[in-house]
Amino acid sequence: MKQAMTPEEIKEKKPYLDWSLTEHEYDYICDKLLKRLPNYTEIGLFSAMWSEHCSYKKSKPVLRLFPTKGKRVVQGPGEGAGVVDIDDGQAVVFKAESHNHPTTVEPYQGAATGVGGILRDVFSMGARPVAILDSLHFGELKNNPTMRYKMEETIRGVGDYGNCIGIPNLGGETTFDSCYNGNILLNAMCVGLMNIKDMEHGKAVGLGNSIMYVGAKTGRDGIHGATFASADFSKEHETQRSAVQVGDPFMEKLLMEACLELILKHRDWLVGIQDMGAAGIVSSSAEMATEGNAGMELNLDLVPQREPNMSAYEIMLSESQERMLLCVKKGHEEDVKKIFKDYNLDAVTIGRVIEGENYVLYHEGEKVCDIPVRSLTEDVLEEPSKEIKPQYIIDAEKMPAWRPSFESSGEILKRLLNQPTIANDQFITQQYDSQVRSNTIVKPGSDAGVLRIRHTKKAIAMCTDTNGRFVYLNPKIGGQRSVIESVCNIVASGAKPLAITDCLNYGDPNDPEIFWSLRESCQGIADACRIFETPVVSGNVSLYNENDGQAIYPSPMIGMVGLIKNTDYVIPMHVQEADDIVYLVGKTTADFAGSEVQKMLQGKISGLPEAPNLELIHDYLKNLHKAMTQGLVTSAHDLSEGGLAVSLAESVFDTEFGLNINLSEFDKTLLFSETPGRLIVSVKPENKSAFESLLGSAVQEIGRVTDQRKLSIKLANDELNTDVASLEKIWKESIPCLMKSKA
């Protein structure tokens, strides 16, 4: 098939500018890497592989800040997913990915294929996916029917894909803020389990070994999806639907089972395996060849296609879903085909490993590409980004701290429970199957989801956490607080934190203020990860999250996994028994910058969040976890949005109990402070002495669990006495009422 343009026409008309490749990069490719003009197919491959989504050319210097090694880390960043040792020859495998741009444009398919892609990353490692989590960030729902529609479709996409494939969704988080009105965020996380001996890699090596394409056929959906994800939106972004992929969860289920059968039962046939994700065939094949220090030759006429007359450019850049690329030992091609045939899936040899390190493509009898493979994967032109500290942060450093003023603590609590970010998210989670496979111990709605590991006493805990408001106000402190939030959630479940994955969601990195925020927040994340011994083992970067120049808050999502060695000590979020003692873990300060109460009362956020004492928090959380493993803690709940008052209320929702709390030395405003690193725990009276001796000054006894459904809080300058049922009604009805609104 004739190329769409000659190399000379490409140089003159510059179509690559529409694919996020700059003129400087084009000249560098021509003059330094190829020493000739690239043809249409080749420049298409460069534009995809050099996109930020694939190359991380802007963010690589920042990613180097992260600690990636640890005594339990088996595989860090660089493969399909991170792998962490959980003893007994087993590992937990996990990764998070963003699908923000596709979900904003086409919410159902964008969300569904976001889930599908992250599943393939995990099972390509040889792990069976056991849980899905999602971190969803929407604009304001009130008076915004478009956002309500996008939310419904996003949730439906996540639920349909996960439910059809039979993997439980163990929760995550949902937040609402006007900064996401033009660019919603969908971050999906998958957790899998495997025996370490079964781990696979994405590599192609061994002269003459075959490159096999398996799974669904290739169509024209998702072409230039990677470059679409590496540019901001315009008012015309609805026309970009063709860059959104279409998923088939039933095909994914078959593909997963076939791949796992091959990996677990016939690993001697397999050299390497990788998902065809962003940038489709070119990304998976070029990365596998690079990893194996090999060359690769592909015949695109052999690629299974569901649409006629596809060009080499279209075949290589299609992001059709449910496809994998294998490197198979020569002589075992028919064996592999038989496995996939049993699942009614295509399995076709489309190429081979060759001498040298060139990447060669043939289409319709012509050589359409012959370039050094590393020019696509490693020779990406990195350009230093400009950075500048935003003026609003400089100004905030000179301003006095904001503190709320109000009459009634009870009324403020009711208003906070009605805020969508705080309100019960059952409207969302009830659309997900959280119990399939019968291993779920703690369902969505708690601080962390908990899943038992069959045939052992172990369990894994998992959570996702984001708070863009804190990161916006002070990126470094906000990054630290994001990690603290995840650590608290994992510890609250009874688990020891192991490692994290991340999704770094930011605006245009060419804006010096945004790039400064990216670097500073990642430094904060790195600092906290070192203190809490939670290395970064996987993740992704999603930049250009803005619409018509309006960027989202810098929103790094932390996905954390922890280990529970004995399921007898899984800790519930809700109080369990009347007369148990209630403790506040961690010190409370007047920390209101970026808080829910500030946004609710001011209509905006401002000021500087307090810097946490990372070492202090690490030490007392370590002691709290020790108390849990000794059976001293009955329940635990993290303090986050809304502060102490909200967490106290949540700990008695869906129970028969109430709380009698004495905070006579607390100013009423402190009920709503969001000081990080705090939890409320309940302890049986007979365990009081042992618990206090372990935690010391880090805990304060604040009250008792009662058998009456009343929340009573005595303060220095107020008293809150409220029926729990009325609070729970507000909390549960907020989101459903907004979704039913006609406005």
Swiss-Prot record:
Annotated binding of Mg(2+) 1, by residue: E97, N540
UniProt keywords, alphabetically: ATP-binding, Cytoplasm, Ligase, Magnesium, Metal-binding, Nucleotide-binding, Purine biosynthesis
Localization per record: Cytoplasm
Annotated ATP binding sites: Y56, K95, D502, G539
An example Gene Ontology molecular-function term: phosphoribosylformylglycinamidine synthase activity
Gene3D superfamilies membership: PurM-like C-terminal domain, PurM-like, N-terminal domain
Principal location: cytoplasm
Catalyzed reaction equations: N(2)-formyl-N(1)-(5-phospho-beta-D-ribosyl)glycinamide + L-glutamine + ATP + H2O = 2-formamido-N(1)-(5-O-phospho-beta-D-ribosyl)acetamidine + L-glutamate + ADP + phosphate + H(+)
Annotated catalytic residues: H53, H99
InterPro entries found in the cross-reference section: PRibForGlyAmidine_synth_PurL, PurL_linker, PurM-like_C_dom, PurM-like_C_sf, PurM-like_N, PurM-like_N_sf
Role this protein plays: Part of the phosphoribosylformylglycinamidine synthase complex involved in the purines biosynthetic pathway. Catalyzes the ATP-dependent conversion of formylglycinamide ribonucleotide (FGAR) and glutamine to yield formylglycinamidine ribonucleotide (FGAM) and glutamate. The FGAM synthase complex is composed of three subunits. PurQ produces an ammonia molecule by converting glutamine to glutamate. PurL transfers the ammonia molecule to FGAR to form FGAM in an ATP-dependent manner.
Protein name, entry field: Phosphoribosylformylglycinamidine synthase subunit PurL
Record lineage: Bacteria, Bacillati, Bacillota, Bacilli, Lactobacillales
